[in-house]
């Protein structure tokens, strides 16, 4: 049974699909793998972040992007936020935004 990859909002979808072409190509490849094999691909594709959040690591000649996602029932994963990586860690404010969105999606807000 396949997984479904969706976005938290149209804004998140548009921001993600506006990634530079090399990064976007890698992101789309990873999401295809997730649809087939599930989100637990392991590094270098996906990694746990804690608190029920995970990341997709998309690399291209232009740099690295990270998309934070959570999983919900019926084999669905929701991309909560995407950011171009500028340092070693995802900025705290982006993680807080992702966590708040996760709580909303899961009905805990």
Specify the residue positions occupied by each region the protein language model found.
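Basic, Lys/Arg-enriched alpha-helical interface segments
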Residues: 1-64, 73-77, 84-109
């Amino acid at each position: 049974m396949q997984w479904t990859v969706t976005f938290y909002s149209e804004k998140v979808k548009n921001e993600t699909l506006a990634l530079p072409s090399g990064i976007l190509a890698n992101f789309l490849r990873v999401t295809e793998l997730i649809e087939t094999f599930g989100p637990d691909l392991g590094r270098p594709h996906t990694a746990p972040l804690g608190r029920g959040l995970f990341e997709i690591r998309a690399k291209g000649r232009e740099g690295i992007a990270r998309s934070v996602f959570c999983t919900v029932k019926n084999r669905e994963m929701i991309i909560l936020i995407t950011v171009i990586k500028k340092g070693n860690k995802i900025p705290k404010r982006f993680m807080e935004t992702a966590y708040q969105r996760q709580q909303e999606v899961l009905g805990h807000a």
